[in-house]
Amino acid sequence: MNIYVEANPYLHDKYSKYADEKYKREGNPFVSFPIHFDDIPSGAKTLALTFIDHDAIPVCGFSWIHWTAANIPAYIGELPEHASEERQDLMIQGQNSFASPLAGSNDPKVIHQYCGPTPPDKDHAYTLTVYALDAELNLQPGFYLNELYQEMKEHILAETSIELLARV
């Protein structure tokens, strides 16, 4: 399985810290980047994804979750730009770290959708992982990352990750 995201070498400004203000909510970028998929294993029914900043550990003490999504149809080939908000019919989305006490948001459009990179201290590498699954997962909107991992057990046919850079 392969995933492709345009980055040269950084994620485009529109999806990260330097997004135009019209693409920000509570100061954070909300337009999700397009993701292309190919070589999805036969037998895959859905895809799930995580977009996590492990470089945040020295800053806040834990890996920062920017986006989680599940039940993406395995046949789609691409999750289009801004799908997190404009194509919610393609997925169910989980809670990100902007709901934590460090960020303190309670706006569902911030905490239950893509909320892009805003590295505070240096360039960060963000890990996008996509999972091919043999089932639709039993999750509710706003699920937690641990619930996603628990539901995926026994259903992962393939997984792949890429690192995407965002500039300070």
Curated annotation (Swiss-Prot):
Residue runs in coiled coils: none
Signal sequence residues: none
InterPro entries for the chain: PEBP, PEBP-like_sf, YbhB_YbcL/LppC-like
Source organism, top-level taxon: Bacteria
Protein name according to UniProt: Uncharacterized protein YxkA
Organism: Bacillus subtilis (strain 168)
